[in-house]
Amino acid sequence: MRYLTAGESHGPQLTTIIEGAPAQLELVADDINVDLARRQGGHGRGRRMQIEKDQVQIVGGIRHGKTTGAPIALVVENKDWKHWTKIMGAEPLTGDEEKEIKRKITRPRPGHADLNGAIKYGHRDMRNVLERSSARETTVRVAAGAVAKKILRTFGIEVGSHVLEIGGVKAEKTSYDQLSNLKELAEASPVRCLDKEAEQEMIAAIDQAKENGDSIGGVVEVIVEGVPIGLGSHVHYDRKLDAKIAAAVMSINAFKGVEFGIGFEAASKPGSEVHDEIAWDEERGYYRKSNNLGGFEGGMTNGMPIVVRGVMKPIPTLYKPLQSVDIATKEPFAASIERSDSCAVPAAAVVAEAVVAWEVANALLERFGADQVEEIEKNIREFNEKARLF
C-alpha cells in the first residue's frame, strides 16, 4: 500500500488517497472518526482543537461499507477555513486584497521548518512553509493509519499506545495485563499515562509550561500484538521492517529519537542480559522468554509484541518567543507566534500508532497478498500453522 496527503493547515481541507488496500474489508467512517477524535484530545492542546471537530468524508474506494480494491480517498474539512479564504486562497489577489491581508511571515521560529523551507523553495512569505509543515497534516495520516489498523484488526492484530514521559516526569507503573487493558487505561487518562501519580505531575508540568509561555515534550510507546513471524526481511537494508517503522516514527512532526524494546539501555548490558531466549510449546509454537528486542530480530518480526518508543521534542512555537532574524530586514526580532499547543505528546502517541500500524499492515499485505480479505486470512492461517510446527 501507499498513500499521499495534500492540503494546508488553514486551507479548505486535508486529503489522503490510499492505494493498495484489499477488497472486501469492512470499513465505515466511524472506524476513522474515532481515531481523529483521539488525536484531538489530551491535556495541553491549544485553541485550534476547540474549533476543529474532525470528521472524515469517504469520497472513493468504499461502497456500502466495504472496500472495493480501488484507491480510497478520504477528506477532512478545516472548519477554520472560513476565516482564511483570502489568506490561503488558490487564486491570485488584487492589489486591494493584498493590503487587507496580514503582513508576510518573515520571522522564522527556531526549531521549525520556517527558515530552511523558505530558503529551499524561495518563499519570501514563510506561511507557504509553515502551513504544510504544520502538525495539522497528521490528521489525514491518522485517517490512513485508521484504515491500516482496521486491516490489522481483521487479522487479529491490535495496536495501542501510551505516554511514558512528559516534561521530565516519568511514569513508573507501566505494567498491564493485556493490550486491551492498556488501551482502556490510556484512554481514561488526559495524558494517556498508566501511572496515576505521574499523570497528575504531568498535568501540572503542562500547566506550568503554558503559564510560562513555553512548551514541553516527552516519550510515547506503541505496542503491536498478534504479529506473525517473518514480516520484513534480513536480505536487504530497505526491507527491514524495524527500519521502516523507525523512519515512520521519525517522520512525525517534532520527533527526534526512536528505540525498540529496551533500546539504548542495551548499550550498557552484556549480551546475556539483552538477547531473548527461544522456547517452543505445542500451542504457541516458537516464542521468546523475554522481549528485550521489542519483537524484532534481523529486521524481521519474531512473533513477540512489537514495542517501539519515540521521543518528541517541545513544540517550537512559543508564546514567549525565542530570538530570531527577520529575513526581510536582517534585523533581530522575536520569532513569529502561531496558535499552538503547550504539549502535544498525548496526541502524538495516537499519530505514532497510526504510522506504526501503516508499516505493519503494509508488511503484512506484502507477505500474504493484498487483493481480498478472504485470501489474506487463509494465507496467514496456513503460514501460522506451518510456523508453529516448523
Swiss-Prot record:
Pfam families: Chorismate_synt (PF01264). Pathway: Metabolic intermediate biosynthesis; chorismate biosynthesis; chorismate from D-erythrose 4-phosphate and phosphoenolpyruvate: step 7/7. Its EC number is 4.2.3.5. Disulfide bonds: none annotated. GO terms for cellular component: cytosol. It catalyses: 5-O-(1-carboxyvinyl)-3-phosphoshikimate = chorismate + phosphate. Its cofactor is FMNH2. Reduced FMN (FMNH(2)). It is an enzyme of class 4 (lyase). Gene3D superfamilies: Chorismate synthase AroC (3.60.150.10). FMN binds at residues 132-134, 253-254, 298, 313-317, 339. GO terms for molecular function: chorismate synthase activity; FMN binding. Homotetramer. Belongs to the chorismate synthase family. This reaction introduces a second double bond into the aromatic ring system. This is Chorismate synthase. It comes from Halalkalibacterium halodurans (strain ATCC BAA-125 / DSM 18197 / FERM 7344 / JCM 9153 / C-125) (Bacillus halodurans).
